[in-house]
UniProtKB/Swiss-Prot annotation:
It comes from Pseudomonas fluorescens (strain ATCC BAA-477 / NRRL B-23932 / Pf-5). GO terms for biological process: translation. The keyword RNA-binding applies. Belongs to the universal ribosomal protein uL4 family. Part of the 50S ribosomal subunit. The lineage of its organism: Bacteria, Pseudomonadati, Pseudomonadota, Gammaproteobacteria, Pseudomonadales. This is Large ribosomal subunit protein uL4. Pfam families: Ribosomal_L4. Gene3D superfamilies: 3.40.1370.10. Keywords: Ribonucleoprotein, Ribosomal protein, RNA-binding, rRNA-binding. The keyword S-adenosyl-L-methionine does not apply. It comes from the Bacteria. One of its GO terms (cellular component) is ribonucleoprotein complex.
Length: 200
């Protein structure tokens, strides 16, 4: 299949990578797995046994007229432990490489189908100036955009760093969430070829 390039002639690309069906279920699974993998999972609270103190019972079992109490660190008491205390856990979900690649292909194909993929021969800024990059993007009518190139140019990265709706990634650093999150994905021809190598 052919992919239109903004500032040059159309290029021939793999039908497998850029022309497949959109598998919403698989993409959803990939996004959930990616976001779950980013969770820290270090939340921890104290149960009644973790809270300091509470070894000796506050009063004897019988004869006081009060309700029986075995420890001052019971969850019922102020200063006591938590009933179902959170424990550190691993939230990551297993996703096979084959499934991940298929999800990425599905996302790229959907970007092409919905005209959200803007292909350019090359994209760079001469100086690390936000104003220069903003001017370039405005000329292309791009406001909410992910810029994907074969390798991240330092000037481009620095120029985009202060723009809230612009991000710069290389092909290896692209993920399902970032590709979906932006209105448009600006991608260089070399990055397209790299995606074909990795996902083909």
């Amino acid at each position: 299949m052919q992919l239109n390039v903004n500032d040059a002639q159309a290029i021939e690309v793999s039908e497998l990578t850029f022309g497949g069906e959109f598998n919403e279920t698989l993409v959803h699974q990939a996004v959930v797995a990616y976001m779950a993998g980013g969770r820290q999972g270090s939340k921890q609270q104290k149960t009644r046994s973790d809270v300091s103190g509470g070894g000796k019972r506050p009063w004897r079992q019988k004869g006081t007229g009060r309700a029986r109490a075995g420890t001052i660190r019971s969850p019922i008491w102020r200063g006591g432990g938590t009933t179902f205390a959170a424990r550190p856990q691993d939230h990551s979900q297993k996703l096979n490489k084959k499934m991940y690649r298929a999800a990425m292909r599905s996302i790229l194909a959907e970007l092409v189908r919905t005209d959200r993929l803007v292909v350019v021969q090359d994209f760079a800024v001469e100086t690390p100036k936000t104003k220069d990059l903003l001017g370039k993007l405005n000329n292309m009518s791009l406001t909410d955009v992910l810029i994907v190139s074969d390798a991240v140019d330092q000037n481009l990265y620095l120029a985009a760093r202060n723009l809230p709706h612009v991000d710069v990634r290389d092909v290896q650093g692209s993920d399902p969430v970032s590709l979906i999150a932006y209105d448009k994905v600006l991608i260089t021809v070399s990055a397209v070829k790299k995606f074909e190598e990795l996902l083909g």
